[in-house]
C-alpha cells in the first residue's frame, strides 16, 4: 500500500511539474510572440516543449508545434539571433519558380529528395534587402546558359531535408512531405533589429510582462478557491494535527474569546488581538499555560489550556511538544541546526553559556541574535551524555523576515484565521501577492550580491523546483496555483535582469544603442550572449548537483 501511495505521489509530482513549468514558459513565450506579431516580425515557429517535433501545424507563416520533451518551449523570432545565410558558399541552387517569382530555394542540390527541382548556377542575390527597398532578387543561369534576374517572394522559403532522411528514393508525395522541411526567409524589415527601439523593448518585455499577468491571475484564483484570511474575527480555520491547539482540543469554526496567563485576561476581538497577546506572552520569562476561553461549533462556551510551541526558524530548530524537557523535535538534514551538529532528540541545557530550563529560555536567547554572522553556542545532552559547544550561525532577522514572511523566532499555537471567499478581496490578494513576491525577489537578489548569508549554494535548480512543486501539489489546488504564481513572478523577474542571454540583456543592448546612437555590433552581442548562456548553463548544473546532494543526504 505504501509503495502505491509513493508511486502515486511521484506521478502527481511529475505531472504537476510539467503542467506548472509548461504553463509558465508557454505564457512567457506567448508574450514575446504577441508583440512580435503586432510589430510585423516574422515568427517561424511557436513550440511547446523541446527536442524533436511530435506534431505540428502551420498556420500562416508560423509553425505551431509540440515537441518530445514537455519542459520549456520557444518562439523563433527572426533576428533575435544572428541570421545564418545558407547560400553563403553555394555556387548552384535549385529553385521553385511560380509565375516568374521564386517561391522556394534549395541549397541541398545533391539530395535525391529534390532532384526533380530545376538546377541553376548562382551569380548574385539579395534575400535580405537591408536598405528596405522592397526588392528581393536572384540572378541565376539556367541549364541552357541563359542568365536571368528573378524576383523572390517576400515569404519564400529555403528547402532542406530533415535529419531523419537517409538518401532514400522518393516514390510518392507522402514520403516527400515527411522528409522535406522549409525555413522561411526573413527580409530585413521582418526582423527584430529592423524595428524601432521601443518596439524591440516591448517584444523583450512581453515575455516577463505575461509572467506577471499570469501570476496575478493564478494568485487571484488561488485566493478565490482557498479563500482570503478573515482577520476581522477570531474564528479558526482548520487546525493542524500535532500542534498545541489540536492537542488542546481546538477545532475549525471555534471562536476564541480570551487568553489568560500570568494573572491577566486578554479579550480577543480580531486576529490582531491574538497576535499582540502572543507577543505579550513572549515578553515574559516563565513558560506557563495559556488558558483559552472559546465558543465551540455548537455555540457552547468552553475552556482549555496549552503552552505555545517554540520555533527557531533562523536555524530550523523546533520544540518537541510531546516532551516536558527542552527536547529538539525532528530535524531536517539541510537545516542550519543539523549541519552545526544538533540532532533530533537532543535536550538543550545551555545557550551561550546560560542555563536553560524551558523552551522559552531558548526562544529569548535566539531572539537576541538579530545580526548577520553572529554565532550561538549550545550545550546539549544526547543519549545521557553531554555534547558541548555546538556552534551555529543563525540567519539574520532582516534576511529571514523579508524573505520568509515569518518571524526568525516564533511562538506557535497552531491556529490560523478562518477564510472568506470574496471576489474583490481575492482580486486584491492577487495584486498583493504579486507585489510581495517581487519585493522578496529584489531583496534576495541584494543578498546574493551583498551578503555572506546567502550564496549560490542556496539556490534551487530543476530538481529543487520539482521537489517543491510536488509538495505544493500534495497540499491542494489552491496552494499549487499559489506556487505557480510565485514561480511565474520569479521567471519574469529573472528574465528582466541585464544579462545578455536573458530578455533583460537584449533590453540593455537597446539602451546602450540609444545612448551611443549606434547599435552594439552583432559579433559583440553574439559573444556576450554565448558567454552568459554557458555561464547560466554551468550555474544550473551546479545548483542541480546541490539539489541532488540535499535529497541524498
Which sequence ranges carry the predicted segments?
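Pore domain of cation channels
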Residues: 202-215, 482-496, 502
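Small-residue-rich helix-interface/hinge motifs
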Residues: 9-101, 106-183, 487-516
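PDZ/PDZ-like peptide-tail recognition elements
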Residues: 199-237, 272-333, 338, 379, ...
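Conserved PDZ fold ligand-binding element
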Residues: 246-272, 339-360, 528
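Functional transmembrane alpha-helices
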Residues: 2-4, 175-198, 313-339, 344-347, ...
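Final/C-terminal transmembrane alpha-helix of multipass membrane proteins
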Residues: 529-547
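Alpha-helical transmembrane signal-anchor/signal-peptide segments
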Residues: 36-44, 227-244
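Juxtamembrane transmembrane-helix termini
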Residues: 35, 226-229, 261-264, 450, ...
Amino acid at each position: 500500500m505504501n509503495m502505491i501511495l509513493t508511486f502515486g505521489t511521484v506521478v502527481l509530482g511529475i505531472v504537476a511539474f510539467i503542467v506548472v513549468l509548461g504553463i509558465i514558459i508557454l505564457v512567457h513565450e506567448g508574450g514575446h510572440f504577441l508583440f512580435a506579431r503586432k510589430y510585423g516580425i516574422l515568427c517561424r515557429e511557436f513550440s511547446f516543449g523541446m527536442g524533436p517535433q511530435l506534431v505540428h501545424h502551420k498556420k500562416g507563416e508560423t509553425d505551431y508545434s509540440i515537441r518530445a520533451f514537455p519542459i520549456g518551449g520557444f518562439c523563433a523570432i527572426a533576428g533575435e539571433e544572428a541570421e545564418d545565410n545558407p547560400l553563403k558558399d553555394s555556387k548552384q541552387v535549385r529553385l521553385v519558380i511560380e509565375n516568374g517569382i521564386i517561391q522556394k530555394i534549395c541549397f541541398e542540390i545533391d539530395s535525391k529528395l529534390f532532384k526533380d527541382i530545376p538546377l541553376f548556377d548562382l551569380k548574385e542575390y539579395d534575400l535580405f534587402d537591408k536598405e528596405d527597398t522592397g526588392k528581393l532578387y536572384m540572378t541565376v543561369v539556367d541549364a541552357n546558359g541563359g542568365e536571368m534576374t528573378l524576383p523572390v517572394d517576400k515569404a519564400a522559403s529555403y528547402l532542406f531535408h530533415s535529419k531523419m532522411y537517409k538518401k532514400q528514393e522518393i516514390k510518392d508525395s507522402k514520403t516527400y512531405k515527411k522528409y522535406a522541411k522549409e525555413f522561411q526567409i526573413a527580409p530585413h524589415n521582418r526582423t527584430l533589429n529592423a524595428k524601432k527601439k521601443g518596439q524591440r523593448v516591448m517584444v523583450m518585455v512581453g515575455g516577463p510582462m505575461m509572467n506577471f499577468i499570469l501570476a496575478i491571475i493564478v494568485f487571484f484564483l488561488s485566493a478565490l478557491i482557498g479563500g482570503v484570511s478573515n482577520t476581522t474575527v477570531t474564528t479558526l480555520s482548520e487546525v493542524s494535527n500535532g500542534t498545541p491547539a489540536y492537542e488542546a482540543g481546538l477545532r475549525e469554526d471555534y471562536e476564541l474569546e480570551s487568553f489568560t496567563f500570568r494573572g491577566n485576561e486578554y479579550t480577543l476581538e480580531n486576529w490582531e488581538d491574538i497576535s499582540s497577546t502572543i507577543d505579550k506572552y513572549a515578553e515574559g520569562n516563565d513558560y506557563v499555560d495559556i488558558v483559552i476561553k472559546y465558543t465551540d461549533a455548537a455555540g457552547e462556551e468552553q475552556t482549555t489550556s496549552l503552552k505555545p510551541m517554540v520555533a527557531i526558524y533562523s536555524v530550523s530548530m523546533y520544540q518537541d511538544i510531546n516532551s516536558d524537557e527542552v527536547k529538539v523535535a525532528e530535524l531536517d538534514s539541510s537545516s542550519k541546526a543539523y549541519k552545526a551538529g544538533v540532532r533530533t532528540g537532543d535536550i538543550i541545557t545551555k545557550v551561550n553559556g546560560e542555563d536553560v530550563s524551558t523552551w522559552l529560555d531558548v526562544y529569548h536567547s535566539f531572539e537576541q541574535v538579530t545580526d548577520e554572522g553572529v554565532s550561538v553556542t549550545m550545550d546539549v545532552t544526547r543519549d545521557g551524555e553531554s555534547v558541548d559547544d555546538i556552534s551555529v550561525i543563525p540567519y539574520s532577522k532582516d534576511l529571514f523576515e523579508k524573505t520568509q514572511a515569518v518571524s526568525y523566532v516564533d511562538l506557535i499555537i497552531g491556529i490560523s484565521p478562518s477564510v472568506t471567499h470574496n471576489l474583490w478581496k481575492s482580486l486584491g490578494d492577487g495584486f498583493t501577492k504579486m507585489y510581495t513576491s517581487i519585493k522578496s525577489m529584489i531583496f534576495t537578489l541584494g543578498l546574493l550580491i551583498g551578503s555572506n548569508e546567502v550564496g549560490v549554494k542556496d539556490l534551487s535548480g530543476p530538481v529543487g523546483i520539482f521537489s517543491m512543486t510536488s509538495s505544493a501539489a500534495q497540499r491542494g489546488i489552491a496552494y499549487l496555483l499559489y506556487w505557480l504564481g510565485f514561480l511565474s513572478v520569479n521567471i519574469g523577474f529573472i528574465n528582466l535582469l541585464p544579462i545578455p542571454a536573458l530578455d533583460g540583456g537584449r533590453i540593455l543592448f537597446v539602451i546602450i544603442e540609444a545612448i551611443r546612437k549606434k547599435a552594439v555590433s552583432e559579433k559583440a552581442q553574439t559573444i556576450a550572449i554565448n558567454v552568459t548562456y554557458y555561464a547560466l548553463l554551468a550555474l544550473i548544473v551546479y545548483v542541480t548537483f546541490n539539489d541532488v546532494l540535499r535529497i541524498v543526504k
